[in-house]
């Protein structure tokens, strides 16, 4: 009976005590170290170059940006308060900035919501969802003082400083540019700086997949470095760089500066037997806890596990004396990298499993609150019998790095991917993600969310059911070929999503994720459109304080269960299901 329940409910898996997992990971690390003495350590081959492509489908013209959904408002008692459409691929195409995927990213501020994507930036009224500005990424960076932009943008709002912070590729993708607003108004003036993220080997380079995090001491930007070793050669992974910028260099009376920045380069070579493992897609841990050292987490280059290390010695005015602490592998439940995600694609069977669910890198922000560190990633667990992706969350003790809780959000018959989370000072956690499957009625790629609270032991206790925030408008998303055709090329999705907390009311969480818009043709409302698919983004506001607490029996099962624990059933129609 319990196994049947696991098939019908979202799954939060607390199997395998952390101490046993930690011993297993230590043993695996020792074996890996021994093996490395005789042969080269090779990074996971699917940790690949992610710079987006500016696509141009032959014959596919975008003549309008019709069809945006109106804002959605639910009853104040509903945990899903409001939803509104963000930037779409139609918007980017209007600037001839037609990138895939969007690199979905946004943050909520004092009165606005700001979104960045590959090609376009936008600002919205956070209470009504009304869009107050739309611009190309190139135009935004021009007003901030830079020339050109090339995607991979991220944005955050710093509540203590009441300022916005954005990062993106420069015109040359070896460079990173960093902008800070002068006030809390995202539509006001910004100032910026540019610095070389990774110089390469003399034949071009990319400081790929820049991450962004802030604590009370510094701002952290991690990059995955790629470069060819010959003129015209292909890009290969060359290591990572962690850039640490003290807060005083960021928020000052003039402009952001990197004069007192620390840079930690960890090289990688396919032929080396001594490659250090400081992970892939290094994510600084966001925290408002004063003092102490910074913390960085990442997926291991070699093991199916995450690792963590400290950044020590960042002074109020300088990071130049900072140093990195030793790496600790946290010892997660066994998993493998996820496969492609499913979708119904009723008309074209070949397109039913083409959408990229990504890999196990930590693609979205990581948070510390109340002495605990929270993170999510996409995995294919080895403790189930289905080849389906799950959003895996992990909670760590911030002092010891011991796992307090971990689990998989998922339901049999569906893939779950592109997760993100945020946590407030009350220990309330909201996780957003995509879900899709083969079922024609419920399998379209959907943007979903769930809320949790953290108990005294650090475990997540479900508060809401699975909330449908936005459903895709087509059952067959493929970008790179026209409507009715088989998918061509890699079907990128994401590459990330984000959750942020309203600085005016920390019970309110703003989630942003990707969905599939209608095709660019007459049937989709685009006269003269020639048939390419288009992505969209959706912003949802979830009030964690309005979410009902589970029944006592459910709570007891979730806290004290020794194996996998069933979460609450999905709640859809009662909470609003936007088309």
Where are these regions (language model features)?
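Generic extreme N-terminus detector
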Residues: 5, 14-16, 553, 561
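C-terminal PAP-associated
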Residues: 41-547
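C-terminal membrane-anchoring or membrane-association module
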Residues: 566-579
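Short, Lys/Arg-enriched N-terminal segments with co-localized hydrophobic residues
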Residues: 2-10
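Gram-negative bacterial Sec-dependent N-terminal signal peptides
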Residues: 9-39
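Serine/threonine-rich, low-complexity intrinsically disordered segments
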Residues: 5, 34-36, 556, 579
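A short, hydrophobic C-terminal helix/tail in secreted or cell-surface proteins
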Residues: 550-569
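Hydrophobic alpha-helical membrane context
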Residues: 33-34, 563, 573
